[in-house]
Structure formats: C-alpha cells, structure tokens
C-alpha cells in the first residue's frame, strides 16, 4: 500500500535511487496504490549522469510492495521493500532499459508488457 509521502526504491536503471510518492493517480480521493498502479513521484536521490535528476516530477508504476499482492488461490506475495519503475510522463513506457529484482504477474497487462519482458524474474 503506497500513499502520499511514501518513499520507494527504484527498480530500473533510469538513474534515480529513491523517490517519493506525491499523488496516487486514478480517482479524486484515492488513498492507496498497490502493485500495478500508477503514481506521481518526485526524485529524492539520483546518481550523477543519469536519465533523471533530483527534483524531477514523473509517473511510476508500483512493482513491489511490503503489503503484498493477494492471488485468487489465497496466497500472498510480499516483498522486503516498496519499489517502482519510472515511466515517461506522456507514453507511460519505462525510461530505463533494465529492471532489477522480481516483479509480479499482476503487471501482465497491455500497458506493462515491456516491464515484464525486461524483468529477470516474474513471480
């Protein structure tokens, strides 16, 4: 469960290390975002010579949460931290060319197939 002010790690090579959620997209009073939801983020920590810089405001898709994801069979997949993949503001395609760490099968929609194909492991 990601809400405003939540700090997340970045699971791609866009150049950002830590980001903060500033808005959960999809509804006027939507409070939480889970795996597969798009959020608005600001870059809090970035590496030198990256594709993004500190202070940039972009969109991101949540790929891992500590809260986890509940499957129809009743199982829950939880992770050690909250992570996201940074997206282009217009096309909503990933900025980075590599994804680090596992992602869940819930991302397997038309919009996020690129993330699934780049990920080293799909749970």
From Swiss-Prot:
GO terms for biological process: translation. Gene3D superfamilies: Ribosomal protein L14. GO terms for cellular component: cytosolic large ribosomal subunit. InterPro entries: Ribosomal_uL14, Ribosomal_uL14_bac-type, Ribosomal_uL14_CS, Ribosomal_uL14_sf. The keyword Zinc does not apply. One of its GO terms (molecular function) is structural constituent of ribosome. It comes from the Bacteria. Belongs to the universal ribosomal protein uL14 family. Part of the 50S ribosomal subunit. Forms a cluster with proteins L3 and L19. In the 70S ribosome, L14 and L19 interact and together make contacts with the 16S rRNA in bridges B5 and B8. Binds to 23S rRNA. Forms part of two intersubunit bridges in the 70S ribosome. This is Large ribosomal subunit protein uL14.
